Amino acid sequence: MKEELDAFHQIFTTTKEAIERFMAMLTPVIENAEDDHERLYYHHIYEEEEQRLSRLDVLIPLIEKFQDETDEGLFSPSNNAFNRLLQELNLEKFGLHNFIEHVDLALFSFTDEERQTLLKELRKDAYEGYQYVKEKLAEINARFDHDYADPHAHHDEHRDHLADMPSAGSSHEEVQPVAHKKKGFTVGSLIQ
């Protein structure tokens, strides 16, 4: 578990820096938006990433606490602090997924070389981190909770929809439709 924690710490520290760079890029776009739609669109993305920063401010010290821990018995589902760490890690796996999508959206809008270069670098690092976190958390969750089912697993069921990086020149017509698996009953689906 120590090896995974070291990697998680590196990934989320790097992610925090990436979010700050991304937000710094968005700030002048929001301030100089041509219309309300553009301002609200990027402000919404900015606020979501701002919320992630506050979650990372909680997660990173929690990882550090367990990195320094010598009592292996504390790495157990019976330890509430360890359970919280696992919950925060699973939440941030989804946060990484969202960050990649935000960067992908920005890649469509910002076609200048400087921002394209920055965004592609941020995306590459975030995607690699996401893949590692996704894989390791699946292993950790299987190790500690045999009944665990990732509620977001449908995102990656048949193919990782984040794998194909969009380009600034892509058109909406080039996007292949995603086949959705028919879902069963849901809360409220039987209410008439």
Swiss-Prot record:
UniProtKB keywords: Encapsulin nanocompartment, Iron, Iron storage, Oxidoreductase
Top-rank taxon: Bacteria
GO molecular function, one term: ferroxidase activity
Subcellular locations according to the entry: Encapsulin nanocompartment
Residue spans crossing the bilayer: none
Region (Linker): 143-179
A Pfam family matched in the record: IMEF_Flp
Major enzyme class: oxidoreductase
Basic and acidic residues bias locations: 149-163
Domain characteristics, as noted in the entry: The C-terminus (targeting peptide) is probably responsible for targeting to the encapsulin nanocompartment; it is separated from the rest of the protein by a flexible 37-residue linker.
Complex formation: Homodimer, with 2 Fe atoms bound at the subunit interface (without encapsulin), probably also a dimer when encapsulated. 42 electron-dense accretions can be seen inside the nanocompartment which are probably this cargo protein, although perhaps up to one cargo dimer can be bound per shell protein.
Name of the featured protein: Ferritin-like protein
